[in-house]
Curated annotation (Swiss-Prot):
Gene3D superfamilies: Nucleic acid-binding proteins. GO terms for molecular function: rRNA binding; structural constituent of ribosome. The gene is Mrps17. It is found in: Mitochondrion. Component of the mitochondrial ribosome small subunit (28S) which comprises a 12S rRNA and about 30 distinct proteins. GO terms for biological process: mitochondrial translation. It comes from Mus musculus. Belongs to the universal ribosomal protein uS17 family. CDD domains: Ribosomal_uS17. InterPro entries: NA-bd_OB-fold, Ribosomal_uS17, Ribosomal_uS17m_metazoa. This is Small ribosomal subunit protein uS17m.
Length: 120
C-alpha cells in the first residue's frame, strides 16, 4: 500500500506576486508571524514560493492563492496558482462591496444623486 505524500508542508498559501519574469511561473512571497520564545514577541517571517501559472494571468502586486502540487513540476516549482484573490489596483471592500483606494472609497460619478431639471 503506497501513500501519496505532498513534497511540501504548506498545502495552501496566500501571498503577493513579486515577479513574473520566468515563463509560466510566478514568484510569490508569503509572510507569516513567528513567535520568538525568548522575547515573547511576534516577528514577520517571509518565504518565497515559485508557482506554475499556466495562463500567465497574474501580474506583480497581485494577491494570490497557491495550491501545493502532489508531484513537483521542477526542482523549485512545487505550487500552482489556484486563484487571484485581488488584482493589483482593483481592491474591493469585503463589507460594502465598493472599490477602494487606501482608506477612501472610490465613488463613480454615476452613483452620485443628480439634481432634477426644473421645467418652467
Amino acid at each position: 500500500m503506497s501513500i501519496v505524500r505532498s513534497s511540501v508542508h504548506a498545502k495552501w498559501v496566500v501571498g503577493k506576486v513579486i515577479g513574473t519574469a520566468m515563463i509560466k511561473t510566478a514568484k510569490v512571497r508569503a509572510t507569516r508571524l513567528v513567535l520568538d520564545p525568548y522575547l515573547l514577541k511576534y516577528f514577520n517571517k517571509r518565504k518565497t514560493y515559485f508557482a506554475h501559472d499556466a495562463l500567465q494571468q497574474c501580474s506583480v502586486g497581485d494577491i494570490v492563492l497557491l495550491r501545493a502540487l502532489p508531484v513537483p513540476r521542477s526542482k523549485h516549482v512545487k505550487h500552482e496558482l489556484a486563484e487571484i484573490i485581488f488584482k493589483v489596483g482593483r481592491v474591493i471592500d469585503p463589507v460594502t462591496g465598493k472599490p477602494c483606494a487606501g482608506t477612501a472609497y472610490l465613488e463613480s460619478p454615476l452613483s452620485e444623486p443628480r439634481e432634477e431639471l426644473k421645467v418652467s
